[in-house]
Every structure is written in C-alpha cells, then in structure tokens.
C-alpha cells in the first residue's frame, strides 16, 4: 500500500537529491568545489578544502575572487617570493583577491574549511580555463 504525506512533501523528501543534481561536486586532490550560481558578471562557488590540503598557487587574468570562509579555518597565501603574505581566515572572514594576484588556499587544521567564493568579471570569461599555476615549495 502506498501512503501519501509521510515524511514531508515531495520537495522536502527529495531535496538532497535535487541539490546533488543541480550542483554536482567536482573532486580535486585538495577537496571539492560546486558551481552554485552564474549571473551577469559573477559566479558563485562552494569550495571545501580538506584537512591538511592546499590548492595550487595560481592567478587569474579575467576575474577577481572574493573568498568568504563560512566554517573551519584557512590560510590564504598571497604573492610570491619576498612579497608573499599569509592571511589566516576564521569563521565569517573574507579576503579579496584581485585579477592577476598570485594566491593559494590551504587548510592546515583537522576539520574541513568551507568557503563561498564569488568570481567577478566578464561572464563569458568566468571559466576554470582562466588559470595560471606555478609550483611553490
């Protein structure tokens, strides 16, 4: 026998499935990201940096990025060589990364770091291809 209205309405009972369908995870060695929204001149992403992991040192020609830490802790390494600065982010902190600025996000704790990242730039150029990486020690 099939029973209706058990466990909430249909949208509530399958919301986890809809969330995974609308914004699947892209797995990386440092954790994962999800594309959440693309608007005119901006893109919103969720980044999760796993414990004791770092993204690559990178910069972008066509976009700036605003990183908003929503849980956990993270270090943002900005610049290279003698101009390198390390910013520690805790809950609700944010950092603006300008176009062309070298940066690398790291999580040196035992809990995941959750970041909401906002890209700003020309909509057509807001892609994962807009990246230059270098190896750092």
What do these predicted regions represent?
Residues 18-57, 86-91, 128-137:
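A short, N-terminal "cap"/entry segment at the start of jelly-roll beta-barrel domains
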Residues 62-81:
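Glycine- and acidic-residue-biased ligand/ion/polar-headgroup-sensing regions
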Residues 46, 65, 117:
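Acidic-residue sensor for enzyme active/binding pockets
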Residues 56-57, 76-77, 97, 103-110, ...:
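Short beta-strand His + acidic residue motifs that chelate non-heme Fe in jelly-roll/DSBH
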Residues 104-137:
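Double-stranded beta-helix
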Residues 53, 62-63, 101-102, 111, ...:
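A generic "binding-loop/recognition-motif" signal
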Residues 1-29:
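Classical nucleotidyltransferase
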Residues 80-102:
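Short acidic-glycine-tyrosine-enriched beta hairpin
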């Amino acid at each position: 026998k099939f029973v209706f209205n058990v466990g909430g309405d249909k949208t509530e009972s399958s919301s986890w499935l809809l969330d995974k369908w609308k914004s699947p995870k892209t797995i990386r060695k440092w954790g994962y990201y999800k594309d959440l929204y693309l608007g005119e001149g901006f893109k919103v992403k969720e980044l999760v940096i796993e414990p004791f992991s770092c993204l690559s040192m990178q910069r972008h020609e066509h976009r700036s990025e605003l990183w908003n830490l929503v849980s956990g802790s993270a270090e943002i390494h900005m610049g290279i060589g003698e101009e390198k600065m390390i910013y520690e982010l805790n809950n609700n902190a944010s950092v603006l990364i300008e176009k062309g600025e070298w940066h690398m996000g790291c999580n040196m704790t035992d809990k995941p770091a959750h970041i909401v990242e906002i890209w700003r730039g020309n909509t057509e150029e807001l892609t994962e291809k807009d990246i230059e990486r270098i190896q750092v020690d």
